[in-house]
Amino acid sequence: MYFQLTGTHVRLLGSMHLFSAASPRTPAWVVQAFDWAEALVFESDAQAILPFLKREGGQSLEHALPPEVWRRLDASWPSAGVLAPLGELRPWAAMMAAPTLCQRVVEGVEPRMLREAATQAKPYWYLETAEEVVASLESIPLSAICTGLELLLADLTEPQRTLERMQAAWLRRDLQSIYDVAAESPIFSLAGIRSAILDGRNCAWAPRVREALGTPKRTLVVVGALHLCGEGNLIERLQYPVEQIPFCD
């Protein structure tokens, strides 16, 4: 979960973007990783993606989804805020947001680190632009999005269960267990979604991380833990030796 790229000043940390509200504390090894770093690298700027959640004109999302999926989503969708109205969202935005409406969560690693980086004047940058994130998400086939939403609506308790199990594995720093939990998640099992969210982005990120390997600054690269496990993970794509960093009490 926390790796040193051998012979460099770069480390790699697998994060959780959201924590269960029942387990909100940042673990000590994550705090230690932040304290070690003189500079940080994150996936992307979440705030910069918000303007892309909605379409500019065109047909309502209602016309892209199966009638029953639309009916059930629309009945429980927030009536205000960045996700409203449902009809204006891009299909991938509805798919990404829908599970969080079934979860009891608090912010995860990245927002906390970003605030602390600003407080301590630590520099940071991103592995991808908002436009690149959106291009990846736009590549998800509509059929996969519809299937993912149907699977979600078939068991609205699954997102919270999966989050809690994944966070428990993450707190143990057990990458294999994280992957095993994710593999049981219906959405993760859909190749079109997995490829866009994980595989393709890992491919794009690897050369950008490699470019940073010569930095004299202690640099911490923070990506979602799922990017570090399974076939085609970021460590594999880097083609560079890494060492697990032991946790010091």
Predicted regions span which residues?
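C-terminal structured interaction module
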Residues: 210, 218-249
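Structured, acidic catalytic/metal-binding patches in enzyme active sites
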Residues: 2-197
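A short, acidic, amphipathic alpha-helical segment used as a generic capping/interface helix at domain edges
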Residues: 197-217
